[in-house]
């Protein structure tokens, strides 16, 4: 399996996003999106997935963080798809349950090339919460947008379920950590499947 790296540059009237990743890294990251809490979540995603990430986003945060958050996830998903290539030799499936104090999240990932997202279990008010200190806040509803944008651009099937949780920060962080750990397993090389695509179809990109 060759070293799996990718670089994506994406520019629109709403944002400019530059993403570089290394799937076989050590979870090192340099993240700047203009939304502090989102930087924290992406740093967490990098650390616990083992994917090195360098992400720089500038956007119309004077409106709010929505465009910058979503567009960053789109570019990150595109980078994942590029780095995974034909997916030869990967494990393909990953499943993780991660706690953060009172919060508990489960994420199941299939790197199948068939995008799908199912999110459930969050408290009713989570979508309306704004998280962050000074500067641009992160609205709780953006977690679904991130998962959807990431999955549909990377070709992932993602099932994310909050099993318990009260604090909005803890809920988001448990969810991102669960995604990270599930991804770490799914993209890892499977020595028993070296050089082969883990599918009876013989391909995961069609």
Swiss-Prot record:
Record-listed E.C. numbers: 4.2.1.19
Signal peptide, first to last residue: none
Pathway entry: Amino-acid biosynthesis; L-histidine biosynthesis; L-histidine from 5-phospho-alpha-D-ribose 1-diphosphate: step 6/9
The keyword Flavoprotein appears for this protein: no
Keywords: Amino-acid biosynthesis, Cytoplasm, Histidine biosynthesis, Lyase
Molecular function in Gene Ontology: imidazoleglycerol-phosphate dehydratase activity
InterPro entries xrefs: IGPD_sf, ImidazoleglycerolP_deHydtase, ImidazoleglycerP_deHydtase_CS, Ribosomal_Su5_D2-typ_SF
HAMAP family, A to Z: HisB
Name of the protein in question: Imidazoleglycerol-phosphate dehydratase
Organism: Cutibacterium acnes (strain DSM 16379 / KPA171202)
Gene: hisB
């Amino acid at each position: 399996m060759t070293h799996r790296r990718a670089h994506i540059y994406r520019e629109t009237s709403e944002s400019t996003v530059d993403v570089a990743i290394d799937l076989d890294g050590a979870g090192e990251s340099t993240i700047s999106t203009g939304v502090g809490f989102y930087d924290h979540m992406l740093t967490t995603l990098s650390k616990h997935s083992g994917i090195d990430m360098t992400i720089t986003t500038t956007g119309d945060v004077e409106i709010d963080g929505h465009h910058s958050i979503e567009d960053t996830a789109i570019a990150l998903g595109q980078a994942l798809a590029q780095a995974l290539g034909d997916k030869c030799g990967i494990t393909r499936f990953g499943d993780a349950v991660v706690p953060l104090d009172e919060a508990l999240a489960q994420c199941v990932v299939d790197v199948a090339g068939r995008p799908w997202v199912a999110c459930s279990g969050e408290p009713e008010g989570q979508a309306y919460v704004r998280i962050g200190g000074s500067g641009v806040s992160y609205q709780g509803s953006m977690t679904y947008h991130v998962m959807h944008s990431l999955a549909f651009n990377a070709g992932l099937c993602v099932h994310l379920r909050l099993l318990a949780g009260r604090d909005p920060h803890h809920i988001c962080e448990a969810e991102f950590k669960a995604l990270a750990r599930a991804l770490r397993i799914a993209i890892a090389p499977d020595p028993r499947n070296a050089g082969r695509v883990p599918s009876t179809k013989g391909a995961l990109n069609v």
